[in-house]
């Protein structure tokens, strides 16, 4: 076996890409800070029971597991940072008021996620805790759109959904976990014939509503009007539609480059979310570049229920799609023993310039830098000249 081989769907990030990723990471985290978000850095390893608290079975399947040599307990290599950040808010910070947290760190998946070609991601996200109103959802969506704008992705397609609609339709039905997951799969695939067959064991009004969800996607106004007519009257459904209507009205003016739509069958993470859900799509990527929504019940697993909303995305994917050119301009300098040269180089670096000293007997091959200037000795001083 070749020693340089990596596990399947695990890759190295090369210099030019790493430079772009880091540039975006800094810019995005600075953006979040300007909105009042505080950066947290949870550990990449945790005890498994803590790591999976308040999450669904999908995360358990995606988590690498190993035994702690000190305690003998099972550890998990995180596959999602969101539960960790919820733990920090609920258990460690323990604040009564609104808390805004952001994060950026590596996550690993035991299985390659559907629609992806990588089992390792650089997850970046932002969460708002302590606010149960639609304004927090709007802020999360606004910040997501700003994130994509920072990366140079101006044309965005934003899909909205709501976990409360399916909860209202299934209210009073005794369905086990496996049945719910099967239903979720049929809704995601929009397989109307199979869903019709599957739902024959349910009351007629429930079966009819489930099948209707598949067709409830498209322009916001049309979908909302159709949903009010075709979905059953239920407090949870009425509230969900009202939430979406209010959010659509507020989000319509966020950006002229954002196309809003609703897809009530897009319920990925249904067991995790408790309210508004959203997914952002961009050109050249068939799956969402970012997902988010409300998940008010997660903090309850840590003994302190707190309303929460937010989003996350893979920074590596964002960098790959970003049209921005972050290749840095640089200055070359010879490697000679000269006190004045050393002072000149130090002064330039203090100003933020990249100065690369070319070692004796070598040629410069730093492809990620464009060396357009050089330090040249003029009399007794060193000056920057264009090449």
From Swiss-Prot:
<dbReference type="InterPro" id="IPR004517">
    <property type="entry name" value="HisZ"/>
</dbReference>
<comment type="function">
    <text>Required for the first step of histidine biosynthesis. May allow the feedback regulation of ATP phosphoribosyltransferase activity by histidine.</text>
</comment>
<protein>
    <recommendedName>
        <fullName>ATP phosphoribosyltransferase regulatory subunit</fullName>
    </recommendedName>
</protein>
<dbReference type="InterPro" id="IPR045864">
    <property type="entry name" value="aa-tRNA-synth_II/BPL/LPL"/>
</dbReference>
<comment type="pathway">
    <text>Amino-acid biosynthesis; L-histidine biosynthesis; L-histidine from 5-phospho-alpha-D-ribose 1-diphosphate: step 1/9.</text>
</comment>
<dbReference type="InterPro" id="IPR004516">
    <property type="entry name" value="HisRS/HisZ"/>
</dbReference>
<dbReference type="GO" id="GO:0000105">
    <property type="term" value="P:L-histidine biosynthetic process"/>
</dbReference>
<comment type="similarity">
    <text>Belongs to the class-II aminoacyl-tRNA synthetase family. HisZ subfamily.</text>
</comment>
<keyword id="KW-0368">Histidine biosynthesis</keyword>
<keyword id="KW-0963">Cytoplasm</keyword>
<dbReference type="Pfam" id="PF13393">
    <property type="entry name" value="tRNA-synt_His"/>
</dbReference>
<comment type="subunit">
    <text>Heteromultimer composed of HisG and HisZ subunits.</text>
</comment>
<dbReference type="InterPro" id="IPR041715">
    <property type="entry name" value="HisRS-like_core"/>
</dbReference>
<dbReference type="GO" id="GO:0005737">
    <property type="term" value="C:cytoplasm"/>
</dbReference>
<keyword id="KW-0028">Amino-acid biosynthesis</keyword>
